[in-house]
Amino acid sequence: MLILSFLCPAFLNAQIVTDERMFSFEEPQLPACITGVQSQLGISGAHYKDGKHSLEWTFEPNGRLELRKDLKFEKKDPTGKDLYLSAFIVWIYNEQPQDAAIEFEFLKDGRKCASFPFGINFKGWRAAWVCYERDMQGTPEEGMNELRIVAPDAKGRLFIDHLITATKVDARQQTADLQVPFVNAGTTNHWLVLYKHSLLKPDIELTPVSDKQRQEMKLLEKRFRDMIYTKGKVTEKEAETIRKKYDLYQITYKDGQVSGVPVFMVRASEAYERMIPDWDKDMLTKMGIEMRAYFDLMKRIAVAYNNSEAGSPIRKEMRRKFLAMYDHITDQGVAYGSCWGNIHHYGYSVRGLYPAYFLMKDVLREEGKLLEAERTLRWYAITNEVYPKPEGNGIDMDSFNTQTTGRIASILMMEDTPEKLQYLKSFSRWIDYGCRPAPGLAGSFKVDGGAFHHRNNYPAYAVGGLDGATNMIYLFSRTSLAVSELAHRTVKDVLLAMRFYCNKLNFPLSMSGRHPDGKGKLVPMHYAIMAIAGTPDGKGDFDKEMASAYLRLVSSDSSSAEQAPEYMPKVSNAQERKIAKRLVENGFRAEPDPQGNLSLGYGCVSVQRRENWSAVARGHSRYLWAAEHYLGHNLYGRYLAHGSLQILTAPPGQTVTPTTSGWQQEGFDWNRIPGVTSIHLPLDLLKANVLNVDTFSGMEEMLYSDEAFAGGLSQGKMNGNFGMKLHEHDKYNGTHRARKSFHFIDGMIVCLGSDIENTNMDYPTETTIFQLAVTDKAAHDYWKNNAGEGKVWMDHLGTGYYVPVAARFEKNFPQYSRMQDTGKETKGDWVSLIIDHGKAPKAGSYEYAILPGTDRKTMTAFAKKPAYSVLQQDRNAHILESPSDRITSYVLFETPQSLLPGGLLQRTDTSCLVMVRKESADKVLLTVAQPDLALYRGPSDEAFDKDGKRMERSIYSRPWIDNESGEIPVTVTLKGRWKVVETPYCKVVSEDKKQTVLRFLCKDGASYEVELEK
């Protein structure tokens, strides 16, 4: 049974959970099943971790505490379907550290089955989560009915609380620390290696600190302080808010011992997942006892202290409150060597810890607590991880997001010693390598501007990671510790790409990860920080491109009233205005809206921009998943990357947002993501069936195709194309296939599909041309009498559509749907234009063109004389030409078996993307791309079940995910003799009057181009 705890003092000390396996010692009498040998046992209120009491155990040398009852141990599921393991969980309090260990023994009818040691060389609370079958010595057995805790060969006293004899837990997350260093020994998860990495040693030698280095340390400290703190005033309202929040924790001292409301990390609730009905992973946060709010308050107090006058009563009060909170949280186990049993993703909970301690460095020094605080920060920031020279480029995006601030704070907390200098050199090198382009699907940044987390381009995680990366690049800029030009330029290119695919600030829907809610945005401040960090080569004090990008982005209402998602870094408007003013005073001006074309091979994304609009295509492949689904996140977005094409637009002079582009969540039919070819399912069937499929992953779904061909080409950064072989995963409708292409030529986007097929006889297959929300009177009036005219359609947002095939218009006022996270019903007024391929189609196809920012007159003229003609549209290739633009666009799904139509390009020796632009009578621009990332070659690495169906497996289980993109040679044969200036990636194989043969070496899904001359 769960005992609810509300945010008021009377409830904050309530026992969290009651269960027969859980001992919290809240009754006045000792439980009858507990006895002692050479021990004194009692219930104590001196220290407590759950409720207000704990078990006090005073022992003689080798004394024993015995608990006799069924321990409820359960073996692991022999079928392998349930991956959880039985764990023993306990919290121990020690007043006097001893360099010794107690032994936990688990017996069945008096016979010892399993055991583990627990070190007691600490003061305060420590926890252990120990899996019986993986972490303990011996062999646990079902029916074990006794727990013994054996004292060391010395007397002492411990307090025990929150003891759970056995409960099934996610076996990935238990964490080793100084007390239980053997737990989960095989893990390499970057959240869980605090103990292992605390043992790392430096490879950079200690050297004396020179005067110049001492000056740089002061500069770094000033820059960091300015980064995390802006001088202000302490208002009476702020002081009163702090007092109220502080009082909730009921911190008191008695006989030199501190106590107060117990504080946990959010993941501690995972102990109860299999113990209580309606378990909520955020229950501790809702109960007001999670440490994120605690550290946020500590930071708030630190800021108030720094904002108050020296010697003032408020300053003295804030100092007292901070030190009391410091003592209490240290006592609660936030200390060197402690991991609370389960610590995964703790970085989000302790974010306020680092700036809070750093801002109170002088106070901690005066109180004699600075060394202890330094060690605490270095432990949780895993600062020793920076010691060894990185073996390769890249680090996890979470490290940039949650560890950079902590690591630099833990280092800058130190006095100016050779050890501090050694840490700074190691840290700047770690940042440098972390910012460089990472291989394969590794985090964080890609050579093409992609920003990776969860093995895909993921802007929602990138905004947090870029906060750390940009701040650290700025911090070290123009010092002897500055990052390399490659590292600096890579992060700059990521930001330039992000401001290209976002419009104006918002992520495209298909690039929103598991948050398709229209709220995710880039962070203009990242551009500001990079602007004042100077140029990548270190020669310029300002970066002009970053400055002008920032001034364009910040001119939007970037801090609007709507609630920003939790994952977005918080930035003050005052800070934005301050840097904007500085840049303008230095002569910088906002850039115009970006124009051109961008292809992200490491995102399976193509973007075309003209005027203020953008068109964003996204697909998926055997390397890059289609959508990420969690329980309660993105329940219906299965088709987000099934060849989608979103038009982001607004009337001239207005800021582009999802709303101005005709999108809202209310009433949106998740089957009809624009551009996709999909089976139109009832929402119950479209809803993700989220599973825990292996030990490498949690409860999540990220499905892959078995096709390598998916991605885009960009010619001269102005035009491009995109192609994909669509093959849905067998988990749902594995017979569904299509060949899809988009051709981006100036202000025209031509969309082609062929070979659409599946065997689903129950529901129709559709290609969605548009689905738009109708939200105001003008839009309702527009659609009242508008049903299109034959091949020409104009929507109410100024986008024109040329549809030479049969299409169906739907006006659903209202249209019902569901929220992506809760599944709650929504409704809104929507219009859709779709191509219906019928049920179980075979050899289905479509053709249409989109002209954003146009008018009906232009569209009518276009329909009479389209600016393109399709030369081939079948399983092998989609080829079209635009005579007025002198462009021929090739999406070659298969190796051509005969001469290609279109003139210049006669054949290629493999599938690829090609674009040819005739620049003059005897000059041609030729662009070639191979969208296959070639992280491995040969057939797709599928595993099949007994029925021959592709099994669902997590991306994290694949051995090739960190491989470099392989080089794929692409040989093209051109009609006639052409002169080519060879490059490292393009060589002439042969040439004569009839033909010229070139070989391109393609990798990274990149586009390679050469100029041909007669």
Curated annotation (Swiss-Prot):
The active site is at residues 345, 454, 461. SUPFAM superfamilies: Chondroitin AC/alginate lyase, Galactose mutarotase-like, Galactose-binding domain-like, Hyaluronate lyase-like, C-terminal domain. GO terms for cellular component: extracellular region; periplasmic space. Its EC number is 4.2.2.21. Divalent metal cation. Requires divalent metal cation for binding of dermatan sulfate substrate, whereas it is not necessary for the binding of chondroitin sulfate substrates. Prefers Ca(2+) or Mg(2+), binding 1 ion per subunit. InterPro entries: Chondroitin_ABC_lyase, Chondroitin_lyas, Chondroitinase_ABC_I, Gal_mutarotase_sf_dom, Galactose-bd-like_sf, GH-type_carb-bd, Lyase_8-like_C, Lyase_8_central_dom. The record marks 344 as: Important for catalytic activity against dermatan sulfate substrate. GO terms for molecular function: calcium ion binding; carbohydrate binding; chondroitin-sulfate-ABC endolyase activity; chondroitin-sulfate-ABC exolyase activity; magnesium ion binding. Pfam families: Lyase_8, Lyase_catalyt, Lyase_N. Changing residue 344 to Q: Retains 5% catalytic efficiency against chondroitin 4-sulfate only. Specific activity for chondroitin sulfate substrates increases moderately (2-fold) while an increase of 25-fold is observed for dermatan sulfate as substrate upon addition of Ca(2+) or Mg(2+) ions. Increasing the concentration of Na(+), K(+) or Cs(+) chloride from 0 to 0.1 M, increases the activity against all substrates. Further increases in salt concentration reduces the activity dramatically, with 50% inhibition occurring at 0.15 M and nearly complete inhibition at 0.4 M salt. Keywords: Calcium, Carbohydrate metabolism, Lyase, Metal-binding, Periplasm, Signal. Belongs to the polysaccharide lyase 8 family. Monomer. This is Chondroitin sulfate ABC exolyase.
